[in-house]
Amino acid sequence: TENIIIDHCSFSWSMEENVTMYDNKYTTMQWCILSEPLYVSKHDKGARGYGAQWGGEHSTFHHNLFAHCVGRTPLVNGARDKSASGHDAFVDTEIINNVHFNWGNKGALYGGQLHSIVEGAYSRTNLINNYYKPGPATNTFQDRWFADCSHDASSATGLGEWYIDGNMFETNEYKNDKNKGDHSKVNANNWIYADENNSKKAVNLRAGIDKINEIKLTAPSAN
């Protein structure tokens, strides 16, 4: 599936993710609401309640609202297809200007792995200018982060690349996390607490400000 825009839609009450996308190309989701997935329904894995699984080659996810999801806001699929002729091998993902409210886990977003065996495959994610506001269901863990770039990376075939900048946590919302509710440092520099020293972590290969033009979408965007 190619050349798709999903605009001004609402998605709720799913048993797993409210929206799941993969094997797609040139896709934009904009100005949508993804909220209230069912936490305990009839899923054979038990409690779920996720926002979205976002995949495909050359995709943009902007100006959307995630509300009242346990996690996966979104799960970034990355380059996941392990067949030699597989799709989703050359992945550029933009996640920009979204609002994340009242997620349940300590990490609102994760993924971006590189699992494809296609020669030259890559997974590049731009996470820019998103706003994170904890709510009543947000667990008050010691740590809280924008993105778990290392998720499942120990089984990956290579490292994903991330450009992360301009994302903002609501400050002073909760006083008992690692930063005592003061997120001014990480708001000023989203990489300040990043672990870049573990070879199993996808964040080990990060795309700096000098590479932003290289990893932006070069294919025609749908928005």
Would you name each region that the model predicts?
Residues 2-13, 25-44, 50-76, 80-105, ...:
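Right-handed parallel beta-helix
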Residues 75, 89-223:
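Extracellular beta-rich repeat passengers
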